[in-house]
Amino acid sequence: MVVAAATGDPLRKSRTLRTENMDELSKNDVVKLLQENQGRMAIPGGLLMARGKKDYVGGMPALSGTLFFKDAHTPAVRDAICACFKEYQAVAGQYLTWLWREEPKDGKVCLAYCDAPPMPDMMKKLGEGDAVSFGYTSGKQSVDAGEWEFQAFGIRGWKAKMGTWGLSSVRFSMPLLYVEEHPLAFQTMFVKFADLLKAVHGYGGHALVLSLVRRTDNEPVEALMAEQMNGLDVGEPIQNAKGAGAGIKTVSWLTAINNELLEKVGGITALRSELPRDWFAAYPYSDGVVIQAGPYAEFATVNSDPLPARYILPNMFLKDVRTPHIGSLHSASKYGEARIRGAAADKWLARFDVPPEELLSFKAKLLDEPKLTKETTLPERL
């Protein structure tokens, strides 16, 4: 695989160990592997582009959570976004280095994190007709991708009132090593954010965190990796905002769904029936539930297990509330490089679909997949 070679063999190795030989590895082995190879996971900027600057970090593997919600133009929801960042800041603040803003009311578009005003102060200066736009990263250079990242995007009030512009979003990421060392941190934060934002839906799992301001030049790497890993998130929330208004984008290790959407597929009773609690946990939040699929996130690599039952079963359960069409996950190609657009994007949405007659075989397959453990499950489950 080209990307693995470019980012160092340890990325390929860690993926293979996690998906194929997890039973043979102790937790300490996984942590040691990530510790020894942290610096080799960075993907050079513009790696698959014919032209463009290459002297920066274009992407970093991480766990990423995305939540879609309504009414980001209102004071209450803007306060909720600030509360989310406060939670994130308590964990990631020491690693953050840069803040990017779109159309700031005052100051520069890019600020060193140490010089940035508190988010509530910046938020208060925004009017209802202003877009919410904050992007915090841990990259060494301002254009570098970082394993720690927090993005908040809120559509303008007039767009929100039209009801045709989709949903706003918050996206956060954590390094793979941090999640291994703190096995409940990602789930805790994801559920907390869903609760604060009254999320309509969302997902959390493996992702490639791309440069905040040079995303377009690094999408081809994401496209190539997505061909090899079904468990990898693709596309940015801002680009997917309209599609998010029509239904969920995908399932992942964590999947948030509000009560309105859940009722359309049979409610909590159907969830408990279709997703056995030995493998799936349901955590309540203010407006719905978060479903955890197994003890850890799956890459679902094509050369090991592209169709894990822990992802197939929730996908089929929630398929009827999935957005039917997303348009494009990537921007247009510049020089003929690979992108996930149009029919390819719709195919990606359906990557975990299986014929209904095969569901029974995946329920049988689930019996051989890792179960939840006390160490990997939050206590506040239904």
Protein language model features and the residues they cover:
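Compositionally biased low-complexity segments, especially N-terminal hydrophobic helices
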Residues: 2-6
